[in-house]
């Protein structure tokens, strides 16, 4: 069989230096609200490029600039408790899921909104319609219908995802282990 002379969408998204030329708004916007979302100031950093590089760069930026560890000493024991304002493993899982499951037909970027109180990841159009919100919040978001199966295969090869519906349970576990509030999922 002859090979197709045209690149596949997943190939452009992972291997072209500027996939946003073909898919507008393929980017991750990280927005910092130092006064909260209702404040008058914000700072933004926009990440573009091949999906894996863009995702890793956004995660590194978030980790370097916004994650803080607090050490709590206890009077009657030698071990201190260490907690993070936002656990990195949960953020990593959530952002990779957003890249994996977003619609590349939508002309909206993935947006990470950060304030002192919360970190919100917006990705459109949200979870697949076959996943109920109640199941998502309970960590039972098991769907064998993937919006972007080929993207998932590439992310799996890059050790960025497992592709076995483990993302939401991992986010819930990491948040609980850190002593963080249960994350809120909305559709």
Residue ranges and their predicted role:
Residues 7-11, 15-56, 86-187:
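Conserved beta-strand-loop-beta-strand hairpin that lines the nucleotide-binding pocket
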Residues 1-7:
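Core subunits and conserved enzymes of cellular information-processing
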Residues 42-44, 51-80:
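Helix-hairpin-helix/helix-loop-helix acidic hairpins
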Residues 81-85:
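Conserved mid-sequence domains
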């Amino acid at each position: 069989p002859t090979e197709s002379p045209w690149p596949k969408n997943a190939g452009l998204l992972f291997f072209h230096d500027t996939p946003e030329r073909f898919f507008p708004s393929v980017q991750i916007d990280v927005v910092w609200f130092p006064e909260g979302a209702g404040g008058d100031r914000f700072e933004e950093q926009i990440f573009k490029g091949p999906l894996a590089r863009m995702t890793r760069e956004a995660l590194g930026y978030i980790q370097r600039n916004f994650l803080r560890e607090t050490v709590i000493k206890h009077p009657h024991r030698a071990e201190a408790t260490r907690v993070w304002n936002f656990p990195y493993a949960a953020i990593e899982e959530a952002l990779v899921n957003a890249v994996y499951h977003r619609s590349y037909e939508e002309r909206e970027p993935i947006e990470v909104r950060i304030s002192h109180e919360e970190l919100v990841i917006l990705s459109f159009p949200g979870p697949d319609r076959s996943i109920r919100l109640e199941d998502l919040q309970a960590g039972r978001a098991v769907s064998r219908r993937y919006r972007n199966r080929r993207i998932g295969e590439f992310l799996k090869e890059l050790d960025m995802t497992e592709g076995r519906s483990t993302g939401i349970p991992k986010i819930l576990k990491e948040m609980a282990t850190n002593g963080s509030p249960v994350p809120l999922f909305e559709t």
